[in-house]
Structure formats: C-alpha cells, structure tokens
Swiss-Prot record:
Protein name, per record: Uncharacterized protein MG385 homolog
Alphabetized InterPro entries for the sequence: GP_PDE_dom (IPR030395), PLC-like_Pdiesterase_TIM-brl (IPR017946)
GO BP of this protein: lipid metabolic process
Listed SUPFAM superfamilies: PLC-like phosphodiesterases
C-alpha cells in the first residue's frame, strides 16, 4: 500500500496520449489514485481538458479560446503519439466527471489560463457544472498558478479544496504566509523547487502536492517526507 497518493499526470501519459480518454482509462486500470488535468475554455464557453493553448483546424492554427467545441471534437489527439493507437478526441470536463469522478480517489483540476478575466469566467462555469456532481467537494482539488484565481475559486466554490501551483520564489514574494494558508488547503510546488526550498515550504504547515516526479529514486525519496501527500507522475511507481 502506498504511503501517499500517486496521481497520473494527464492520465497514464507514458503509454497513452495525454489528457485523453485512453490515458485516463489506463490510469484507472493500472491503479493510480487519481488524475491531474488542465482545464480551459473554448470559444463557446465549454470547459475542456487540455494543456495545449493552440490547435490546428484545417490549414490554420488557432488559439483554443477562438475555437468552438464542435470543431475541436474533429481533431484526433492521438495522431502525433509515439505509437499507433485508436483515435482520441478532446474531452469536456463534464464527460470526464461523469466517467471518472466515482472510480478515482481524487481529480486535480489545474486552471491553466493566464488571463484573470478568462479564469473568472471558467470558475463561474465550473461552479454551475459541479452543482450536478455530489462527490465533487470530496474528490476534487482545484489548482491555479494565479493567486487571484485561487481567491475567486474560494468565493464561488466554498468548501472546495484549493491549491496554489508555483515553481519559483517570484510567485511567492508578494504573498504573505497568512494569505496563502487562509486561501489554500495545499501547496503545489514543482519537484526541483521543493527539493531546494523544502524547509521554507514546510514552514507553511500545508500538505504538499508535488509535480512532476520523474524516476523511481525520486519517488522513493519523497515517500518518507511527511509533508508530501500527493506525487504527480506520468509513470506508475
């Protein structure tokens, strides 16, 4: 039995195209405790699961925010994968929640947008969507690398678990420790930043979500860290 929760980064993405149904189903089959996925808004305000900012539609590349869901659904996400697998289309968050919220212990949703206003629209859409999922408060962790988005999440989705995502001191320098502990249930530093600054980050007293772990030795090293509760990885350990 694992000491911590092992979360599949964009699904089991070493053996399947990331952020696809195939990757999520593989993570379930092989026994990951949960999924990490990025969520963004389409032009027609649908929440989709993707880490990509741009997609090629026809002969032109467009921003995701300029493409409607119906056109995104025409794109085969498995086309560039390292091995030949069945066609995969982009998933809406609703589709993911309907199939994968129940079987996994946790789903980690990273709000990827860089624009504050766009993130607020996404949070509002998310609040409406989650009203229909009884297990959402228990199983979801909502993450952002923008502290204003964290605050807005807490305003619109009270009692949901939130986490601040960061990889440098620059992201922390303008925030007080009290601000962070009052607004976040977790801290989510990347592996290398946490490795260099673990004592400082542990002083916040918040459990750690650590991303992205690469290699068995690194995974085993953090197994004995009492602050680390989640390890995010694309590989099964």
């Amino acid at each position: 039995m694992r000491k911590q929760f092992l979360i599949a980064h964009r699904g089991y993405s070493t053996i399947a195209p990331e952020n696809t149904h195939l990757a999520f189903a593989a993570a379930q089959l092989f026994g990951f405790d949960g999924l990490w996925m990025e969520v963004q808004l389409t032009k027609d305000k649908q929440i989709v699961v993707t880490n990509l900012d741009n997609y090629k539609v026809g002969n032109k590349t467009h921003k995701l925010s300029d493409i409607n869901l119906v056109n995104l659904k025409k794109i085969n996400l498995a086309k560039q994968f390292k091995v030949n697998v069945q066609e995969q289309t982009i998933l809406t968050l609703k589709e993911v929640l309907m199939e994968f919220l129940t079987p996994f212990r946790f789903l980690l949703l990273f709000i990827k947008g860089e624009e504050e206003q766009q993130n607020q629209v996404l949070v509002e859409q998310l609040a409406q969507l989650l009203e229909g999922f009884e297990l959402a408060k228990e199983k979801l962790i909502l993450l952002s690398s923008h502290f204003s988005t964290i605050k807005y999440l807490n305003e619109k989705l009270k009692s949901f678990k939130t986490s601040f995502v960061f990889n440098s001191k620059k992201q922390l320098v303008h925030l007080t420790k009290d601000e962070i502990t009052q607004n976040c249930r977790f801290l989510a530093p990347n592996d290398s930043f946490y490795h260099k600054n673990c004592a400082e980050l542990q002083s916040y007293g918040l459990p750690i979500i650590l991303w992205v772990i690469k290699g068995l030795l690194r995974y085993q090293f953090y197994e004995n860290d009492r602050f680390v509760k989640f390890q995010i990885a694309a590989q099964l350990y």
